[in-house]
């Protein structure tokens, strides 16, 4: 892969992919998927490839202004027999972007650390073999905090995963301390509450604490994503029939599909 040197957020990137000597050599049809980290959320998109020579392909893609990191994956074959080249063993075709001042964007350090730690963060099944050390994840997360600590409410779930790597998932004292600290230093959001509720409920097995946090969430955010999920699961558990149909119609009146799709927390 060539052509991408120091990509800038908001720019049109252009690259050349040489398949000679790799797993996709001599394939007549290739596709490309781009993984994008934008404002602390991941999404995927397709990139159109143009064949230049037998084993040489060219692609372009317009990055968004808030794209902090992206990764390319090249594919051939059908879903059930897919061959992939993403330079897995050597760290992937992964790039951080710079802003107009030459600085990394919010999420750049964090994305660089967590994306390359699939054993912990499982982002998009991009890597199958490559995996950085725990200490490296901590270093990049620390750098994100040094530069963009004010954004912690957006990536508190990832930050707490890093804490679990360092302190152990069962370290309740660390979780208690950080929950109190974040409550004091930030305007607490539903996402922060939900993150800690999940930690207490599933990792620490502290149902009482988890239930108390959930009660706060449902009271403060009666139409939030937690209430939406609870209502959905209640309807899902109902037997088939008129009552379930009525409740389902009521659900989509209260939570229109378009609003659910556009809710950033539905993508977490």
Roles of regions detected by a PLM:
Residues 1-236, 241-268:
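Glycan-association/targeting regions that enable binding to alpha-glucans and other polysaccharides
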């Amino acid at each position: 892969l060539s052509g991408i040197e120091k990509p800038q957020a908001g720019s049109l990137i252009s690259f050349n992919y040489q398949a000679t000597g790799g797993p996709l050599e001599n394939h007549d049809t290739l596709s490309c998927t781009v993984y994008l980290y934008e404002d602390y959320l991941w999404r995927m998109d397709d990139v159109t490839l143009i064949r230049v020579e037998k084993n040489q392909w060219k692609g372009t893609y317009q990055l968004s202004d808030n794209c902090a990191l992206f990764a390319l994956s090249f594919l051939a074959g059908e879903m059930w027999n897919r061959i992939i080249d993403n330079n897995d063993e050597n760290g992937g075709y992964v790039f951080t972007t710079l802003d107009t001042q030459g600085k990394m964007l919010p999420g750049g350090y964090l994305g660089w650390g967590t994306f390359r730690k699939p054993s912990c963060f499982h982002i998009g099944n991009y890597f199958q073999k490559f995996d950085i050390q725990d200490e490296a994840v901590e270093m990049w997360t620390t750098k994100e905090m040094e530069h963009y600590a004010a954004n912690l409410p957006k990536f508190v779930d990832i930050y707490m995963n890093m804490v679990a790597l360092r302190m152990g998932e069962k370290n309740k004292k660390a979780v208690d301390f950080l929950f109190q600290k974040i409550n004091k230093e930030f305007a607490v959001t539903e996402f922060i509450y939900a993150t800690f509720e999940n930690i207490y409920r599933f990792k620490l097995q502290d149902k009482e604490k988890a239930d108390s946090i959930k009660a706060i969430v449902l009271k403060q955010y009666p139409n939030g994503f937690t209430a939406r999920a609870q209502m959905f699961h209640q309807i899902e558990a109902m037997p088939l029939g008129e009552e379930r149909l009525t409740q389902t119609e009521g659900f989509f009146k209260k939570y229109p599909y378009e609003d659910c799709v556009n809710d950033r927390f539905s993508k977490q």
